[in-house]
């Protein structure tokens, strides 16, 4: 399950690593922090290194929080995969000069392009790498957790396309130029006895109407986005049909 990343990190036994073995798991976490992640100072790693302590799970849980891991101690496989991903990124950062000039093989590039044509179809939704990545993005973007990771991925894609692309950001930053409004054409319906107050009340009413229209637009967009997710057979297996 973790063989590729363990191999990339030069772990001594990538093929035989057993995360369910408590002693092996704790020793692995110590190795990962000491050799690859190095989040703590050397003098602060004592609690984590004390693998025989009954309080070790508490120290490990704190460690997960300190490195901003989105998973809890109960999600052992996901947490391990996330920590391995962090270690790989740090390893690359430490050796950027070594890897920056590597050129991918042309045949592999062509194969990858074909596979990526339909990314949602080719994804292995049971892969821990996929689950960990989707969960990390969902936590970062504050998207509610869903049992179907593919549904969460599509929600992430919609949010990124609508809010975080260059065009979306530029559009959000544009200053809206309003049109002049003739207040005398909008009947207030009551009289305060003061012309200035009447005019202020008319302005407030028009602003409130504009806010309601914007709210309705956002509600409609949200409904369409939800329908696009739940009505897609690729993300809702209940809608998938074979034959008639």
Swiss-Prot record:
It comes from the Eukaryota. Induction: (Microbial infection) Up-regulated specifically following influenza A virus (IAV) infection in a viral replication-dependent manner (at protein level). One of its GO terms (cellular component) is perinuclear region of cytoplasm. The modification N6-acetyllysine is found at residues 20, 62, 98. It is found in: Nucleus; Cytoplasm, Cytosol; Cytoplasm, Perinuclear region; Cytoplasm, Cytoskeleton, Microtubule organizing center, Centrosome. Coiled coil: none annotated. Its main location: nucleus. Widely expressed. Expressed at high level in heart and skeletal muscle. Expressed at intermediate level in liver, pancreas, fetal brain and fetal lung. Weakly expressed in adult brain, adult lung, placenta, fetal liver and fetal kidney. Overexpressed in many brain tumors. GO terms for biological process: negative regulation of protein kinase activity; positive regulation of transcription by RNA polymerase II; RNA transport; tRNA splicing, via endonucleolytic cleavage and ligation. Pfam families: RLL. PANTHER family: CLE (PTHR15924). RNA-binding protein involved in modulation of mRNA transcription by Polymerase II. Component of the tRNA-splicing ligase complex and is required for tRNA ligation. May be required for RNA transport. Belongs to the RTRAF family. This is RNA transcription, translation and transport factor protein. It comes from Homo sapiens.
């Amino acid at each position: 399950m973790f063989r590729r990343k363990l191999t990339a990190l030069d772990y001594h036994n990538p093929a035989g690593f057993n995360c369910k073995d408590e002693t092996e798991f704790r020793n692995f976490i110590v190795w990962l922090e000491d050799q690859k992640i190095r989040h703590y100072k050397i003098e602060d790693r004592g609690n984590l290194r004390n693998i025989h302590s009954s309080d070790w799970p508490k120290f490990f849980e704190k460690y997960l929080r300190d490195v901003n891991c989105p998973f809890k101690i109960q999600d052992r496989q996901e947490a391990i995969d996330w920590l391995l991903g962090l270690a790989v990124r740090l390893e690359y950062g430490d050796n950027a000069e070594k890897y920056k000039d590597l050129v991918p093989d042309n045949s592999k590039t062509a194969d990858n392009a074909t596979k990526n044509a339909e990314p949602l179809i080719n994804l292995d939704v049971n892969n821990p790498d996929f689950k960990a990545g989707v969960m990390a993005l969902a936590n970062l973007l504050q998207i509610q957790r869903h049992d179907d990771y593919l549904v969460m991925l599509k929600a992430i894609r919609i949010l990124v396309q609508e809010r975080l692309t260059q065009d979306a950001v530029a559009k959000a930053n544009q200053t809206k130029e309003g049109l002049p409004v003739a207040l005398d054409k909008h009947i207030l319906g009551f009289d305060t006895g003061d012309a200035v107050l009447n005019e202020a009340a008319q302005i407030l009413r028009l602003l409130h109407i504009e806010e309601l229209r914007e709210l309705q637009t956002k509600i409609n967009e949200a409904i369409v986005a939800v329908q696009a997710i739940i009505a897609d057979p690729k993300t809702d297996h209940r809608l998938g049909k074979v034959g008639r």
